[in-house]
Amino acid sequence: MSIDIETTLQKAYPDFDVLLKSRPATHYKVYKIPKRTIGYRIIAQPTPRVKAIQRDIIEILKQHTHIHDAATAYVDGKNILDNAKIHQSSVYLLKLDLVNFFNKITPELLFKALARQKVDISDTNKNLLKQFCFWNRTKRKNGALVLSVGAPSSPFISNIVMSSFDEEISSFCKENKISYSRYADDLTFSTNERDVLGLAHQKVKTTLIRFFGTRIIINNNKIVYSSKAHNRHVTGVTLTNNNKLSLGRERKRYITSLVFKFKEGKLSNVDINHLRGLIGFAYNIEPAFIERLEKKYGESTIKSIKKYSEGG
């Protein structure tokens, strides 16, 4: 199956060829945001023009590529809650994290993934994908190209790259009565069988090497084995011992404190919008908690938070 991205974009953007020659892989604004624990995360955001073309490219790729069902991030109709639900009834849990995930994905990994899916792409279209969907950190003429955190095309491309990996890991897990899901760089495994999650851990190591060499690796500082005897969390959602999903005590306290500050008029615009997102997240996971907030602070307060976020 052959795809022609160039012709479609040339029709949509009269100045497309000029923009391509201007090395769009360097058209990024770079800034840092602090991580939850230590250090900073580098965000590289493309210019609005490049961003628009990235979105168009993804729409074209969606018509010709396959994303595995194990992928739950950046997939239409799936979210963090769906990812957690996969594991809510299991006793044993394993969580793995991939090091600097987006920044480890290169054009070559994408092209290999497309070839595995029998997608034929010309050198011209490969160059187009390199320039518009990858970030040249150094801005040098032959600088290394990687996916950036901040580009709208990065999530979908990462799912294409990981598709064959997800397929192999899913098959292994099915044979061993293990549930598997991947939310971007967060890999979660769960089971009711004793002593099998270590096998999954080893399988991930060997499968990463087979598909990516040493390019994409496990973060050994973030390996978590857990069970119902301990607190279990999957992509920010707490799994309770009675097979329910919960926000967890710490997050509930945090949201409650923000609602109190909102009512006192002590939150900035940015904080209010952040709170709005948390309220929506909480309602999807534990609606009874939102009902308790409404009783404590008034329904009008919670409605005001939602209304504010909508620009009202």
Swiss-Prot record:
A Gene Ontology biological process term: defense response to virus
Keyword Cytoplasm attributed: no
Signal peptide range: none
UniProt keyword annotation of Nucleotidyltransferase present: yes
Keyword terms: Antiviral defense, Magnesium, Metal-binding, Nucleotidyltransferase, RNA-binding, RNA-directed DNA polymerase, Transferase
Residue ranges of domain Reverse transcriptase in the record: 14-239
One Gene Ontology term of the molecular function aspect: RNA binding
Record CDD domains: RT_Bac_retron_II (cd03487)
InterPro entries (UniProt xref): DNA/RNA_pol_sf, GrpII_Intron_Splice-Mob/Def, Reverse_transcriptase_msDNA, RT_dom
Entry EC number(s): 2.7.7.49
Name this protein carries in UniProt: Retron Ec83 reverse transcriptase
Record organism: Escherichia coli
